Amino acid sequence: MAITKEDILNAVAEMSVMDVCDLVKMMEDKFGVSAAAAVAVAAGPVAGPAEAAEEKTEFDVVLVDAGSNKIAAIKAVRGATGLGLKEAKDAVEGTPFTVKEAASKEEAEALKKQLEEAGAKVELK
């Protein structure tokens, strides 16, 4: 009687991890193949650059420069973050400062507009 694939699978399931690694190495040597190549083929083709460039959904709003009107920038940062006056002043003077992390696109754009209206330079990352 021939050994079935299910018999082999059951035998491998009972082996320790080290024994399975040894078995894979022996199969690679015997058949002249690489298990890594088989995994890559099974995974399918790699996505092209167009597919890999998915649109970001979360943005970090970074204050790059407070501009000429630091008081307006401090007020805008306080309103956006809820920081106290001293903390907001330190943040504005210590640019670059991440005002908000992982904001939605709409929220990040609105915050950027608010800070730019106060005279600050802002980046979305």
From Swiss-Prot:
On the tree of life, the source organism's domain of life is Bacteria
Q: Can you supply a Gene Ontology BP term from the record? A: translation
* Coiled-coil ranges from the UniProt annotation: none
One GO cellular component term, please give it: cytosolic large ribosomal subunit
GO molecular function terms listed in the Swiss-Prot or TrEMBL record: mRNA binding; structural constituent of ribosome
Q: Which UniProt keywords apply?
A: Ribonucleoprotein, Ribosomal protein
Which InterPro entries does the protein's record reference? Ribosomal_bL12, Ribosomal_bL12_C, Ribosomal_bL12_C/ClpS-like, Ribosomal_bL12_oligo, Ribosomal_bL12_oligo_N_sf
Q: Does the keyword Ribonucleoprotein apply?
A: yes
Matching Gene3D superfamilies, A to Z?
3.30.1390.10, Single helix bin
Q: Which function does this protein serve?
A: Forms part of the ribosomal stalk which helps the ribosome interact with GTP-bound translation factors. Is thus essential for accurate translation.
State the similarity comment.
Answer: Belongs to the bacterial ribosomal protein bL12 family.
Q: How does it assemble?
A: Homodimer. Part of the ribosomal stalk of the 50S ribosomal subunit. Forms a multimeric L10(L12)X complex, where L10 forms an elongated spine to which 2 to 4 L12 dimers bind in a sequential fashion. Binds GTP-bound translation factors.
Name-wise, this protein is Large ribosomal subunit protein bL12
